[in-house]
Amino acid sequence: MAEGEDVGWWRSWLQQSYQAVKEKSTEALEFMKRDLTEFTQVVQHDTACTIAATASVVKEKLATEGSSGATEKVKKGLSDFLGVISDTFAPSPDKTIDCDVITLMGTPSGTAEPYDGTKARLYSLQSDPATYCNEPDGPPELFDAWLSEFCLEEKKGEISELLVGSPSIRALYTKMVPAAVSHSEFWHRYFYKVHQLEQEQARRDALKQRADQSISEEPGWEEEEEELEGIVPSPKEAKIPKETKTTTSPEDEPAPQSPCEETPVEPPAEATPSESSESISLVTQVANPAAAPEAPELPKDLSQKLFEASLEEQSLAEDEGETGPPPPPPSKPLTPAGRASGPEPRPPARVETLREEVPTDLRVFELNSDSGKSTPSNNGKKGSSTDISEDWEKDFDLDMTEEEVQMALSKVDASGELEDVEWEDWE
Protein backbone atom coordinates (compact mmCIF):
# COMPACT_ATOMS: atom_id res chain seq x y z
CA MET A 1 0.00 0.00 0.00
CA ALA A 2 2.84 2.34 0.82
CA GLU A 3 4.49 1.69 -2.55
CA GLY A 4 1.23 2.43 -4.39
CA GLU A 5 0.88 5.73 -2.61
CA ASP A 6 4.46 6.71 -3.49
CA VAL A 7 3.87 5.92 -7.17
CA GLY A 8 0.67 8.00 -7.20
CA TRP A 9 2.46 10.93 -5.65
CA TRP A 10 5.25 10.78 -8.24
CA ARG A 11 2.76 10.68 -11.05
CA SER A 12 0.86 13.70 -9.78
CA TRP A 13 4.12 15.65 -9.39
CA LEU A 14 5.27 14.76 -12.89
CA GLN A 15 1.94 15.76 -14.36
CA GLN A 16 2.00 19.12 -12.58
CA SER A 17 5.57 19.80 -13.69
CA TYR A 18 4.78 18.84 -17.29
CA GLN A 19 1.71 21.07 -17.27
CA ALA A 20 3.72 24.04 -15.94
CA VAL A 21 6.49 23.54 -18.52
CA LYS A 22 3.92 23.23 -21.29
CA GLU A 23 2.21 26.48 -20.30
CA LYS A 24 5.49 28.37 -20.12
CA SER A 25 6.69 27.04 -23.45
CA THR A 26 3.36 27.95 -25.03
CA GLU A 27 3.68 31.53 -23.80
CA ALA A 28 7.25 31.73 -25.07
CA LEU A 29 6.20 30.44 -28.49
CA GLU A 30 3.41 32.98 -28.69
CA PHE A 31 5.83 35.80 -27.91
CA MET A 32 8.24 34.54 -30.54
CA LYS A 33 5.49 34.28 -33.15
CA ARG A 34 4.34 37.80 -32.37
CA ASP A 35 7.85 39.23 -32.69
CA LEU A 36 8.47 37.39 -35.95
CA THR A 37 5.17 38.64 -37.35
CA GLU A 38 6.01 42.24 -36.52
CA PHE A 39 9.50 41.88 -37.97
CA THR A 40 8.22 40.39 -41.22
CA GLN A 41 5.60 43.12 -41.54
CA VAL A 42 8.19 45.86 -41.14
CA VAL A 43 10.59 44.26 -43.59
CA GLN A 44 7.82 43.56 -46.08
CA HIS A 45 6.51 47.11 -45.86
CA ASP A 46 9.92 48.71 -46.35
CA THR A 47 10.81 46.33 -49.18
CA ALA A 48 7.49 46.89 -50.93
CA CYS A 49 7.92 50.67 -50.73
CA THR A 50 11.43 50.48 -52.16
CA ILE A 51 10.46 48.07 -54.95
CA ALA A 52 7.40 50.11 -55.89
CA ALA A 53 9.38 53.34 -56.06
CA THR A 54 12.16 51.73 -58.11
CA ALA A 55 9.73 50.05 -60.48
CA SER A 56 7.86 53.31 -61.05
CA VAL A 57 11.08 55.16 -61.82
CA VAL A 58 12.33 52.52 -64.24
CA LYS A 59 8.94 52.28 -65.93
CA GLU A 60 8.74 56.01 -66.50
CA LYS A 61 12.30 56.06 -67.77
CA LEU A 62 11.60 53.32 -70.27
CA ALA A 63 8.41 55.09 -71.36
CA THR A 64 10.18 58.37 -72.03
CA GLU A 65 13.00 56.90 -74.09
CA GLY A 66 12.03 56.29 -77.70
CA SER A 67 13.35 53.09 -79.40
CA SER A 68 12.54 50.70 -82.22
CA GLY A 69 12.80 47.03 -83.18
CA ALA A 70 13.80 44.24 -80.83
CA THR A 71 15.01 46.60 -78.12
CA GLU A 72 11.54 48.11 -77.91
CA LYS A 73 9.98 44.71 -77.30
CA VAL A 74 12.50 43.89 -74.60
CA LYS A 75 11.90 47.20 -72.85
CA LYS A 76 8.16 46.77 -73.10
CA GLY A 77 8.30 43.32 -71.54
CA LEU A 78 10.54 44.55 -68.79
CA SER A 79 8.23 47.50 -68.17
CA ASP A 80 5.22 45.22 -67.88
CA PHE A 81 7.06 42.95 -65.46
CA LEU A 82 8.07 45.89 -63.31
CA GLY A 83 4.50 47.19 -63.42
CA VAL A 84 3.21 43.87 -62.09
CA ILE A 85 5.81 43.94 -59.32
CA SER A 86 4.89 47.49 -58.32
CA ASP A 87 1.20 46.67 -58.31
CA THR A 88 1.80 43.55 -56.22
CA PHE A 89 4.10 45.03 -53.63
CA ALA A 90 2.58 48.53 -53.52
CA PRO A 91 1.24 49.19 -50.02
CA SER A 92 -2.35 50.13 -49.35
CA PRO A 93 -3.27 53.88 -49.33
CA ASP A 94 -3.61 54.04 -45.54
CA LYS A 95 0.01 52.90 -45.15
CA THR A 96 1.57 55.34 -47.61
CA ILE A 97 3.75 58.17 -46.48
CA ASP A 98 2.04 61.54 -46.19
CA CYS A 99 2.75 63.65 -49.25
CA ASP A 100 2.97 66.82 -47.14
CA VAL A 101 5.93 65.36 -45.27
CA ILE A 102 7.95 63.58 -47.95
CA THR A 103 7.17 61.80 -51.21
CA LEU A 104 9.50 59.77 -53.42
CA MET A 105 9.03 61.06 -56.94
CA GLY A 106 10.54 59.62 -60.10
CA THR A 107 12.24 62.13 -62.35
CA PRO A 108 12.64 61.77 -66.13
CA SER A 109 16.35 61.23 -65.59
CA GLY A 110 15.60 58.03 -63.70
CA THR A 111 16.53 59.20 -60.21
CA ALA A 112 14.27 59.29 -57.17
CA GLU A 113 14.42 62.46 -55.09
CA PRO A 114 12.39 63.55 -52.08
CA TYR A 115 9.76 66.20 -52.73
CA ASP A 116 8.51 68.55 -50.06
CA GLY A 117 4.87 69.51 -49.58
CA THR A 118 4.97 72.28 -52.19
CA LYS A 119 6.35 70.01 -54.90
CA ALA A 120 3.88 67.29 -54.01
CA ARG A 121 0.96 69.71 -54.32
CA LEU A 122 2.33 70.96 -57.63
CA TYR A 123 2.63 67.41 -58.94
CA SER A 124 -0.96 66.60 -57.91
CA LEU A 125 -2.13 69.83 -59.54
CA GLN A 126 -0.37 68.94 -62.79
CA SER A 127 -1.86 65.46 -62.94
CA ASP A 128 -5.43 66.55 -62.07
CA PRO A 129 -7.70 67.00 -65.16
CA ALA A 130 -9.92 69.43 -63.21
CA THR A 131 -7.08 71.93 -63.33
CA TYR A 132 -7.56 72.37 -67.07
CA CYS A 133 -11.27 71.59 -67.54
CA ASN A 134 -12.95 73.61 -64.75
CA GLU A 135 -13.09 77.35 -64.31
CA PRO A 136 -10.52 78.82 -61.90
CA ASP A 137 -11.41 78.96 -58.21
CA GLY A 138 -12.14 82.28 -56.55
CA PRO A 139 -13.76 85.49 -57.78
CA PRO A 140 -13.70 85.99 -61.58
CA GLU A 141 -12.45 89.55 -61.05
CA LEU A 142 -9.19 88.26 -59.64
CA PHE A 143 -8.72 85.91 -62.58
CA ASP A 144 -9.45 88.73 -65.05
CA ALA A 145 -7.00 91.05 -63.27
CA TRP A 146 -4.30 88.38 -63.34
CA LEU A 147 -5.07 87.55 -66.97
CA SER A 148 -4.65 91.20 -68.00
CA GLU A 149 -1.07 91.14 -66.68
CA PHE A 150 -0.21 87.63 -67.92
CA CYS A 151 1.52 87.12 -71.27
CA LEU A 152 1.38 83.62 -72.73
CA GLU A 153 4.12 84.36 -75.28
CA GLU A 154 6.65 84.79 -72.48
CA LYS A 155 5.91 81.26 -71.19
CA LYS A 156 6.74 79.38 -74.41
CA GLY A 157 10.02 78.07 -73.11
CA GLU A 158 8.46 76.90 -69.82
CA ILE A 159 5.57 75.26 -71.71
CA SER A 160 8.02 73.28 -73.84
CA GLU A 161 9.88 72.10 -70.74
CA LEU A 162 6.62 71.02 -69.09
CA LEU A 163 5.49 69.04 -72.14
CA VAL A 164 8.85 67.28 -72.38
CA GLY A 165 9.53 66.74 -68.68
CA SER A 166 6.03 65.92 -67.31
CA PRO A 167 4.27 62.89 -68.86
CA SER A 168 1.00 63.66 -67.03
CA ILE A 169 0.77 67.17 -68.50
CA ARG A 170 1.72 65.87 -71.93
CA ALA A 171 -0.96 63.16 -71.80
CA LEU A 172 -3.67 65.57 -70.62
CA TYR A 173 -2.69 68.15 -73.22
CA THR A 174 -2.89 65.56 -75.97
CA LYS A 175 -6.37 64.43 -74.86
CA MET A 176 -7.96 67.85 -74.13
CA VAL A 177 -6.49 70.20 -76.74
CA PRO A 178 -8.30 71.07 -78.89
CA ALA A 179 -11.16 68.62 -78.18
CA ALA A 180 -12.24 70.04 -74.77
CA VAL A 181 -10.39 73.33 -74.32
CA SER A 182 -8.25 75.59 -76.43
CA HIS A 183 -4.50 75.93 -76.18
CA SER A 184 -4.70 79.33 -74.43
CA GLU A 185 -7.40 78.24 -71.97
CA PHE A 186 -5.42 75.11 -71.07
CA TRP A 187 -2.31 77.06 -70.14
CA HIS A 188 -4.12 80.06 -68.66
CA ARG A 189 -5.91 77.83 -66.16
CA TYR A 190 -2.75 75.90 -65.39
CA PHE A 191 -0.59 78.97 -64.71
CA TYR A 192 -3.38 80.63 -62.69
CA LYS A 193 -3.56 77.51 -60.49
CA VAL A 194 0.19 77.69 -60.05
CA HIS A 195 -0.15 81.39 -59.15
CA GLN A 196 -2.75 80.57 -56.46
CA LEU A 197 -0.52 77.80 -55.14
CA GLU A 198 2.39 80.24 -54.84
CA GLN A 199 0.23 82.75 -52.97
CA GLU A 200 -0.93 80.07 -50.55
CA GLN A 201 2.64 78.95 -49.99
CA ALA A 202 3.72 82.56 -49.38
CA ARG A 203 1.02 82.93 -46.72
CA ARG A 204 2.17 79.72 -45.06
CA ASP A 205 5.78 80.89 -45.07
CA ALA A 206 4.76 84.24 -43.57
CA LEU A 207 2.81 82.53 -40.79
CA LYS A 208 5.69 80.17 -40.11
CA GLN A 209 8.18 83.03 -40.05
CA ARG A 210 5.97 84.99 -37.67
CA ALA A 211 5.68 82.00 -35.36
CA ASP A 212 9.45 81.46 -35.41
CA GLN A 213 10.02 85.15 -34.76
CA SER A 214 7.67 85.15 -31.78
CA ILE A 215 9.46 82.13 -30.35
CA SER A 216 12.88 83.70 -30.89
CA GLU A 217 11.76 87.01 -29.37
CA GLU A 218 10.78 85.47 -26.03
CA PRO A 219 14.39 85.34 -24.74
CA GLY A 220 14.82 88.90 -26.03
CA TRP A 221 11.99 90.08 -23.82
CA GLU A 222 13.65 88.44 -20.84
CA GLU A 223 16.94 90.16 -21.69
CA GLU A 224 15.19 93.52 -21.93
CA GLU A 225 13.59 92.94 -18.54
CA GLU A 226 17.00 92.09 -17.09
CA GLU A 227 18.47 95.27 -18.60
CA LEU A 228 15.64 97.35 -17.16
CA GLU A 229 16.15 95.72 -13.78
CA GLY A 230 19.83 96.60 -14.02
CA ILE A 231 19.06 100.22 -14.88
CA VAL A 232 16.41 100.75 -12.20
CA PRO A 233 18.10 101.04 -8.78
CA SER A 234 17.08 98.65 -6.08
CA PRO A 235 15.30 99.94 -2.95
CA LYS A 236 18.56 99.60 -1.01
CA GLU A 237 20.52 101.65 -3.54
CA ALA A 238 17.82 104.25 -3.99
CA LYS A 239 18.48 107.31 -1.87
CA ILE A 240 15.87 109.86 -0.92
CA PRO A 241 17.04 113.32 -1.95
CA LYS A 242 17.48 115.68 0.95
CA GLU A 243 15.00 118.50 1.21
CA THR A 244 16.46 121.72 -0.05
CA LYS A 245 16.34 124.47 2.45
CA THR A 246 15.58 127.94 1.23
CA THR A 247 18.44 130.19 2.28
CA THR A 248 18.40 133.91 2.26
CA SER A 249 21.22 136.00 0.88
CA PRO A 250 23.58 137.76 3.26
CA GLU A 251 22.04 141.03 2.18
CA ASP A 252 18.56 139.98 3.36
CA GLU A 253 19.66 138.36 6.63
CA PRO A 254 22.59 139.81 8.60
CA ALA A 255 25.26 137.44 9.80
CA PRO A 256 25.47 136.78 13.56
CA GLN A 257 27.84 139.14 15.29
CA SER A 258 29.88 138.61 18.37
CA PRO A 259 29.20 140.78 21.42
CA CYS A 260 32.33 142.83 20.74
CA GLU A 261 31.27 143.56 17.14
CA GLU A 262 27.76 144.75 17.97
CA THR A 263 27.01 148.40 17.32
CA PRO A 264 24.82 150.41 19.64
CA VAL A 265 21.25 150.87 18.56
CA GLU A 266 20.39 154.51 18.13
CA PRO A 267 17.14 155.49 19.83
CA PRO A 268 14.41 156.98 17.67
CA ALA A 269 14.27 160.72 17.54
CA GLU A 270 11.94 162.40 20.01
CA ALA A 271 8.85 164.04 18.65
CA THR A 272 8.70 167.68 19.73
CA PRO A 273 5.40 169.45 20.43
CA SER A 274 6.04 171.69 17.41
CA GLU A 275 5.76 168.79 14.99
CA SER A 276 2.81 169.01 12.67
CA SER A 277 -0.05 166.57 12.68
CA GLU A 278 0.96 165.33 9.24
CA SER A 279 4.33 163.99 10.42
CA ILE A 280 2.75 162.31 13.44
CA SER A 281 0.11 160.82 11.20
CA LEU A 282 2.87 159.39 9.00
CA VAL A 283 4.60 157.81 11.99
CA THR A 284 1.40 156.28 13.24
CA GLN A 285 0.60 154.88 9.82
CA VAL A 286 4.04 153.27 9.65
CA ALA A 287 3.57 151.84 13.13
CA ASN A 288 0.17 150.40 12.20
CA PRO A 289 0.49 146.58 12.36
CA ALA A 290 -1.97 146.17 9.52
CA ALA A 291 0.33 148.09 7.15
CA ALA A 292 3.81 147.20 8.47
CA PRO A 293 5.32 144.01 9.90
CA GLU A 294 6.02 143.57 13.57
CA ALA A 295 9.09 145.29 15.00
CA PRO A 296 12.07 142.98 15.42
CA GLU A 297 13.01 142.05 18.94
CA LEU A 298 16.17 143.50 20.41
CA PRO A 299 19.05 141.11 20.91
CA LYS A 300 19.62 139.57 24.32
CA ASP A 301 23.04 141.19 24.71
CA LEU A 302 21.53 144.65 24.25
CA SER A 303 18.83 143.97 26.83
CA GLN A 304 21.48 142.78 29.25
CA LYS A 305 23.49 145.95 28.70
CA LEU A 306 20.40 148.05 29.21
CA PHE A 307 19.75 146.21 32.45
CA GLU A 308 23.32 146.88 33.64
CA ALA A 309 22.99 150.53 32.65
CA SER A 310 19.76 150.79 34.65
CA LEU A 311 21.53 149.40 37.71
CA GLU A 312 24.30 151.97 37.33
CA GLU A 313 21.75 154.74 36.94
CA GLN A 314 19.96 153.56 40.06
CA SER A 315 23.20 153.72 42.03
CA LEU A 316 23.89 157.21 40.64
CA ALA A 317 20.38 158.32 41.60
CA GLU A 318 20.92 157.12 45.16
CA ASP A 319 24.19 159.04 45.33
CA GLU A 320 22.50 162.20 44.07
CA GLY A 321 19.74 161.75 46.69
CA GLU A 322 22.38 161.76 49.43
CA THR A 323 24.49 164.62 48.11
CA GLY A 324 22.36 166.74 45.76
CA PRO A 325 18.72 167.64 45.36
CA PRO A 326 16.25 164.80 44.97
CA PRO A 327 15.14 163.89 41.44
CA PRO A 328 12.00 165.63 40.21
CA PRO A 329 8.84 163.70 40.99
CA PRO A 330 7.41 161.87 37.96
CA SER A 331 4.15 163.12 36.58
CA LYS A 332 0.90 161.20 36.63
CA PRO A 333 0.31 158.73 33.75
CA LEU A 334 -1.38 160.01 30.66
CA THR A 335 -5.13 159.88 30.51
CA PRO A 336 -6.96 158.70 27.39
CA ALA A 337 -7.44 162.38 26.48
CA GLY A 338 -3.64 162.83 26.48
CA ARG A 339 -3.41 165.27 29.48
CA ALA A 340 -0.87 164.72 32.25
CA SER A 341 -2.14 164.69 35.85
CA GLY A 342 -0.46 166.01 38.99
CA PRO A 343 2.90 164.80 40.32
CA GLU A 344 3.02 161.36 41.80
CA PRO A 345 6.12 159.86 43.47
CA ARG A 346 7.38 156.55 42.04
CA PRO A 347 9.85 154.16 43.69
CA PRO A 348 13.16 153.54 41.92
CA ALA A 349 12.48 149.79 41.73
CA ARG A 350 10.05 150.48 38.90
CA VAL A 351 13.00 151.31 36.67
CA GLU A 352 14.39 147.80 37.08
CA THR A 353 11.14 146.19 36.03
CA LEU A 354 10.93 148.59 33.14
CA ARG A 355 14.40 147.67 31.95
CA GLU A 356 13.47 144.03 31.90
CA GLU A 357 10.60 144.87 29.54
CA VAL A 358 12.79 146.89 27.16
CA PRO A 359 12.73 144.36 24.22
CA THR A 360 9.42 145.89 23.07
CA ASP A 361 9.39 148.42 20.24
CA LEU A 362 10.39 151.94 21.34
CA ARG A 363 8.30 153.48 18.58
CA VAL A 364 5.18 152.56 20.55
CA PHE A 365 6.42 154.64 23.51
CA GLU A 366 7.07 157.56 21.22
CA LEU A 367 3.61 157.41 19.76
CA ASN A 368 1.96 157.09 23.17
CA SER A 369 3.94 159.99 24.58
CA ASP A 370 3.27 162.27 21.64
CA SER A 371 -0.32 161.30 21.02
CA GLY A 372 -1.58 163.96 23.41
CA LYS A 373 0.54 166.69 21.77
CA SER A 374 -0.66 166.17 18.23
CA THR A 375 -3.29 168.58 17.05
CA PRO A 376 -6.39 166.95 15.64
CA SER A 377 -6.15 168.13 12.04
CA ASN A 378 -8.52 165.53 10.62
CA ASN A 379 -11.43 165.73 13.01
CA GLY A 380 -14.46 163.84 11.88
CA LYS A 381 -12.57 161.84 9.25
CA LYS A 382 -12.48 158.10 9.42
CA GLY A 383 -8.97 156.64 9.78
CA SER A 384 -7.25 159.92 10.83
CA SER A 385 -3.99 160.02 12.78
CA THR A 386 -5.69 160.94 16.07
CA ASP A 387 -8.07 158.01 15.79
CA ILE A 388 -5.16 155.68 15.16
CA SER A 389 -3.20 157.08 18.11
CA GLU A 390 -6.23 156.71 20.40
CA ASP A 391 -6.63 153.12 19.28
CA TRP A 392 -3.00 152.46 20.02
CA GLU A 393 -3.41 154.07 23.45
CA LYS A 394 -6.31 151.77 24.20
CA ASP A 395 -4.41 148.70 23.03
CA PHE A 396 -1.10 149.62 24.64
CA ASP A 397 -2.05 151.63 27.73
CA LEU A 398 1.31 151.44 29.49
CA ASP A 399 1.84 152.86 32.95
CA MET A 400 4.72 155.17 31.93
CA THR A 401 5.34 158.85 32.08
CA GLU A 402 7.31 161.10 29.82
CA GLU A 403 10.02 161.31 32.41
CA GLU A 404 10.44 157.55 32.38
CA VAL A 405 10.61 157.53 28.58
CA GLN A 406 13.29 160.23 28.67
CA MET A 407 15.21 158.24 31.25
CA ALA A 408 15.04 155.07 29.12
CA LEU A 409 16.32 156.91 26.06
CA SER A 410 19.14 158.52 28.00
CA LYS A 411 20.15 155.08 29.31
CA VAL A 412 20.39 153.81 25.77
CA ASP A 413 22.66 156.75 24.88
CA ALA A 414 24.73 156.11 27.99
CA SER A 415 25.16 152.44 27.11
CA GLY A 416 26.33 153.43 23.62
CA GLU A 417 28.91 155.82 25.08
CA LEU A 418 30.12 153.15 27.50
CA GLU A 419 30.52 150.69 24.67
CA ASP A 420 32.57 153.21 22.66
CA VAL A 421 34.82 153.72 25.68
CA GLU A 422 35.23 149.96 26.02
CA TRP A 423 36.20 149.72 22.35
CA GLU A 424 38.84 152.43 22.80
CA ASP A 425 40.22 150.70 25.91
CA TRP A 426 40.34 147.36 24.10
CA GLU A 427 42.24 148.85 21.16
Curated annotation (Swiss-Prot):
Residue spans of biased composition, Polar residues class: 368-387
SUPFAM superfamilies: BSD domain-like
Biased composition (Pro residues): 324-333
Entry-annotated residues carrying Phosphoserine: 92, 166, 384-385, 415
Domain BSD, residue spans: 146-198
Acidic residues composition-biased segments: 219-229, 388-397
Region of interest (Disordered), ranges: 208-397
Biased composition (Low complexity): 268-279
Listed InterPro entries: BSD_dom, BSD_dom_sf, BSD_domain-containing
Basic and acidic residues bias locations: 236-245, 347-364
Sites of Phosphothreonine modification: 353
Keywords assigned: Phosphoprotein
Pfam families: BSD
SMART domains: BSD
Protein's UniProt name: BSD domain-containing protein 1
Protein's gene: Bsdc1
